[in-house]
Every structure is written in structure tokens, then in C-alpha cells.
Amino acid sequence: MITALWLVSALSALVYGGLWVLGPVSPLRTVIKMVPVAALALIAYLTGPRHGLALLLPAALALSAVGDGFLAGDPKRWLPLGLASFLVAHLIYVALFWSASAPSAISEPIRGALIVAAILGGLGMLTWLWAHLGAMRGAVSAYVAAIVAMLATGLLLPWAAWPVMVGALAFMASDAILSADLFVGAKIAGSERLSGYAIWALYYGGQAAITLGLMGLDL
């Protein structure tokens, strides 16, 4: 069952990335986009103890899948709801990562340096976007704070959970590329296709890595 769900998740991610990432808005495209991370949520639920902190992972993944559905639609209509879904998902990740953090992690210089780099990266991105955000300034500022907190708390996990750290970084990179595209119109090498592929690959890869990494911890 779990192996089948991993296959469903990975194959639907490949199908969406290969055929629909730049496709027109449609109900089918929305469903296909939601399936990969929804399958990860089901995997996390079925393989976890189904109580306490372990339920935070499937909850964050399920909210992310809902966010995927909103962002598959018309951004002018659904972007605020998509941002809200992912904002709550990030806050759940923050709570989960913090609760599972290594006791001495905060005192390790390398982690401190990485966290400072994450904060500076978030501030730099927000500064660059600021003039283009208009009425979305408050919402985007809250979102950037949440995803930086998600990456920072992920960096406090035991080193054995390194896939979570890589996944959180990939997630933030995906959001940075998406934000540059949505608000500034900036694309990788001027290519909408390259940007679309990068956004999806980093996002799905990040979520899969977070799922794998947390499944290896005793939550």
C-alpha cells in the first residue's frame, strides 16, 4: 500500500511537471497538481502513530495539497487562499520541527550561520519584491517570515534528518522563483518553461524530502 502510494505520488508529479505545469487552468490540471502531495499526506498518516506530534506532518502536507489546488487556478482570484493554505502549513512545520529539534542544536556555530543566511535570504527576497507587492505586502511579508522560520527550525533538527533540511531549502527556493515570476515577471534565463519546471521540481522534491526525513524520526 505504502509503496503504491509513493508510486502514485512520484508518477503524478512527473505527469504534472511534464504535461501540465504550463498548461491552461482546468479542473483536471488542478486535480493532477494536488495528487502528488496529497499522496504524501496519506503516506505520512498511514505510516505514523496517528496521534500527537506525528499528526502534524500529514496535516501540513494536506494543507499544502489544498494550496496546490488554489495555485493551479487563476492567480488573481485564488492566490490569497493559496498563500493562506501554505502559510498555515509552514507554521505547522515550524511547530513540528521545533518539537523534534536536537537539544544542543542552537549552540552549534554552523547551524547558527545557516540560520542567519536563511534570514538574510528571506529579507533580501522581500526587499526585492517590495515595490511590486502593492496590497499583498502584508500577506507576503507574513508568508516570507513563516517560510524562513520553517527553514530555520528545520536546521535545528538532528543531523540524521538532513533530508528535511535539504527539503526545506528546496521549498524556499521554489517559492522564491515563484514569487519572482508572479510579482516581478522575472524568469530563469527569461524562460517561462524553465521557471515552471524549476518551481515544481524544487517544490515537490522538497516536500518528498521533508516527508522522508521526518518518517525516520521518532516523533
Per-range role (PLM):
Residues M1-L219:
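Polytopic alpha-helical membrane-helix bundles and their juxtamembrane interface segments
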